[in-house]
């Protein structure tokens, strides 16, 4: 009887705890990805509204730091395959990125290179930056706590940092994490000259 009661308690607790979610099944046209941003002692939200996923990602964006700070990012199909440069500094209005540049998403080539622990892949953290060898180095996956339509969930994330020649992290604070899915390689957190973290997903 005590065992049954304990099992019931554990089941109840599990309902109120964070459950892991699959972003590939969640992120569709119309989905909103809401990121918390910290930069220059400012805090605000970056709201990404997905418009298309194929043949390339297109999304509207809005920042809540001031009025009319919004636009649209369009990627090329080639960029989704092989781009190695991140576009992090948004300019209001429509913007079509070139074949070498991606925003919020990772290319298939970058994802594949990052998923080889200790090996890394050369990429630019910002337009105009010198390429850095970024890579994963630990097998223990982390989990990011988020809200999905108001419900507590977790997302499995992979941590990437700049690596030295031996395949171990160099001593700086630059990093990003990404969703552990080749079909939905979305940036979850990033620290560069700013800090950004996915905090909520809305599908309705």
Question: Model segments located where?
Answer:
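Sec-dependent N-terminal signal peptides
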Residues: 4-17
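Acidic, serine/threonine-rich low-complexity disordered tracts
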Residues: 21-105, 109, 113-204
């Amino acid at each position: 009887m005590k065992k049954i009661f304990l099992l019931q308690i554990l089941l109840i607790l599990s309902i109120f705890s964070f459950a892991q979610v699959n972003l590939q099944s969640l992120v569709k046209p119309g989905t909103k990805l809401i990121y918390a941003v910290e930069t220059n002692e400012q805090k605000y939200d970056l709201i990404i509204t997905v418009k298309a996923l194929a043949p390339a990602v297109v999304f509207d964006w809005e920042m809540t730091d001031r009025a009319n700070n919004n636009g649209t990012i369009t990627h090329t199909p080639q960029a989704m395959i092989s781009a190695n440069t991140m576009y992090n500094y948004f300019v209001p209005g429509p913007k079509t990125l070139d074949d070498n540049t991606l925003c919020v998403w990772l290319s298939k080539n970058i994802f594949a290179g990052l998923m080889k622990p200790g090996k890394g892949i050369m990429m630019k953290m910002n337009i105009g930056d010198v390429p850095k060898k970024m890579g994963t180095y630990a097998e223990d996956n982390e989990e990011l706590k988020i809200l999905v339509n108001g419900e507590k969930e977790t997302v499995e994330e992979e941590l990437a940092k700049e690596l030295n020649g031996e395949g171990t992290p160099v001593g700086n604070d630059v990093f990003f994490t990404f969703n552990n899915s080749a079909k939905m390689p979305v940036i979850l957190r990033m620290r560069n000259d700013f800090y950004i973290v996915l905090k909520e997903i809305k599908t309705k």
